[in-house]
Amino acid sequence: MDSSEDNPTWTLESLKTSIDDASQAMQVATQLSEMLATNLSNLTLNPSIKLPYLPEYPSQLTGQLPSEKTPHRRRGVRTVLSERRYRMQKLIESLRLRYAKGIPRSDSQRQLQQQEDTEIRSRVRRFQCTCSYCQFKRNPSDDNYENYYNTTYSNYAMESNES
């Protein structure tokens, strides 16, 4: 399959001319870079130095689509501000779901909330010893944390207040 069949505007002559134009532009660019390198020691602006300008060529090659020459726009880049905004939205959403008692929820949301509540209760539940003495002979009121704190640390608190 011939390349001229793909795009009839491209011919052998147009390819040769575009290659010649590119080589001329490359020669001018190398001359410009050499001149800049030699004038690098003189860092002051000198209006007498005349730099050759690059010739203007059409930026769009024949057969190139206009959408191909435009740079892609960057999307989805995470910055500190966007990450903070995202976390704040998630926090607000979670607070709204947790404390919005008056708003009727769907069954799935209710079940999810009940599961979260039971998980929280299971984490908060106090330690219970599984030995036979604690299971059968201890008073259940002794398991109360406030009573334990008051009986264990009350003398220590009184001693620290006296000194």
Swiss-Prot record:
GO biological process, one term: epigenetic programing of female pronucleus
Localization per record: Nucleus; Cytoplasm
Signal peptide (UniProt feature, chain positions): none
InterPro entries (UniProt xref): Dppa3
Pfam families per UniProt: PGC7_Stella
Record bears the keyword Transmembrane helix: no
One Gene Ontology molecular-function label: methylated histone binding
One GO cellular component, as annotated: nucleus
Alphabetic keyword roster: Chromatin regulator, Cytoplasm, Developmental protein, Nucleus
Origin: domain of life: Eukaryota
Tissue: Preferentially expressed in oocyte.
Known role: Primordial germ cell (PGCs)-specific protein involved in epigenetic chromatin reprogramming in the zygote following fertilization. In zygotes, DNA demethylation occurs selectively in the paternal pronucleus before the first cell division, while the adjacent maternal pronucleus and certain paternally-imprinted loci are protected from this process.
Domains: entry comment: Mediates binding to H3K9me2 via N-terminal region, while ability to exclude TET3 from the maternal pronucleus requires the C-terminal part.
Name this protein carries in UniProt: Developmental pluripotency-associated protein 3
Originating species: Bos taurus (Bovine)
